[in-house]
């Protein structure tokens, strides 16, 4: 159990049978009446955002999350096969369980799998990945009227906006959180 006074961004709680992560909180102490904590919560499974107010000192169950380091070994049909780096056991996850970051997942890549009990809540990739550009238009000298970027398709199939000087076959670094080009590798 965790007190609402101990809420901080990133704390996970159980509310109505599902896991919610505290995104933002504000401890309010009005002149009249009792203090309360206004929170913004995000459902870890669905991504739904909720604003909820708790009385100061109110206790709620804290979610005990387990973080496991796994390596993506191969893809079989619609499932991705991962190997636990400690026990060497295999596990399978669907693209829906991995989420939108599946477009940066490559064989041999290590990820952190966040579990609540036996249920997989999310898969965390590294903040940046290095991938090879497999298709992009050639940059034309002096063509900067469009802001100096062009679309490029990387080896995993994801499309990323890159500067005009990037050519096919180059390895680039991409931020997986906001799909931005970070530089050449």
From Swiss-Prot:
GO MF entries: translation elongation factor activity
InterPro entries in the record: Elong-fact-P_C, NA-bd_OB-fold, Rib_uL2_dom2, Transl_elong_fac_P/YeiP, Transl_elong_KOW-like, Transl_elong_P/YeiP_cen, Transl_elong_P/YeiP_CS, Transl_elongation_fac_P
Gene Ontology CC terms: cytoplasm
One of the GO BP terms on file: peptide biosynthetic process
Pathway: Protein biosynthesis; polypeptide chain elongation
CDD domains the record matches: S1_EF-P_repeat_1, S1_EF-P_repeat_2
Gene3D superfamilies given in the database record: 2.30.30.30, Nucleic acid-binding proteins
Subcellular location: Cytoplasm
Pfam families given in the database record: EFP, EFP_N, Elong-fact-P_C
Tree of life domain: Bacteria
Keywords from the UniProt entry: Cytoplasm, Elongation factor, Protein biosynthesis
Keyword Cytoplasm included in the entry's annotation: yes
Chief site of localization: cytoplasm
Protein family according to the UniProt entry: Belongs to the elongation factor P family.
Function: Involved in peptide bond synthesis. Stimulates efficient translation and peptide-bond synthesis on native or reconstituted 70S ribosomes in vitro. Probably functions indirectly by altering the affinity of the ribosome for aminoacyl-tRNA, thus increasing their reactivity as acceptors for peptidyl transferase.
Protein name in the entry: Elongation factor P
Organism: Nostoc sp. (strain PCC 7120 / SAG 25.82 / UTEX 2576)
Gene label: efp
């Amino acid at each position: 159990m965790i007190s609402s006074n101990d809420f901080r961004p990133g704390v996970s709680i159980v509310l109505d049978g599902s896991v919610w992560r505290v995104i933002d909180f504000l401890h309010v102490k009005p002149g009249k009446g009792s203090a309360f904590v206004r929170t913004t919560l995000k459902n870890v499974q669905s991504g739904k955002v909720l604003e909820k107010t708790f009385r100061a000192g109110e206790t709620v169950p804290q979610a005990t999350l387990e973080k496991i380091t796994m390596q993506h070994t191969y893809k079989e049909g619609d499932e991705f096969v991962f190997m636990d780096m400690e026990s060497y056991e295999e596990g399978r996850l669907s693209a829906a369980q991995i989420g939108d970051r599946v477009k940066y997942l490559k064989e041999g890549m290590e990820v952190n799998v966040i579990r609540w009990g036996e249920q997989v809540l999310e898969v965390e990739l590294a903040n940046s990945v290095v991938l090879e550009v497999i298709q992009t238009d050639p940059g034309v000298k002096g063509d900067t009227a469009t802001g100096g970027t062009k679309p490029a398709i990387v080896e995993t199939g994801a499309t990323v906006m890159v500067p005009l000087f990037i050519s096919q076959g180059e390895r680039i670094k991409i931020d997986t959180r906001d799909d931005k080009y970070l530089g050449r590798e």
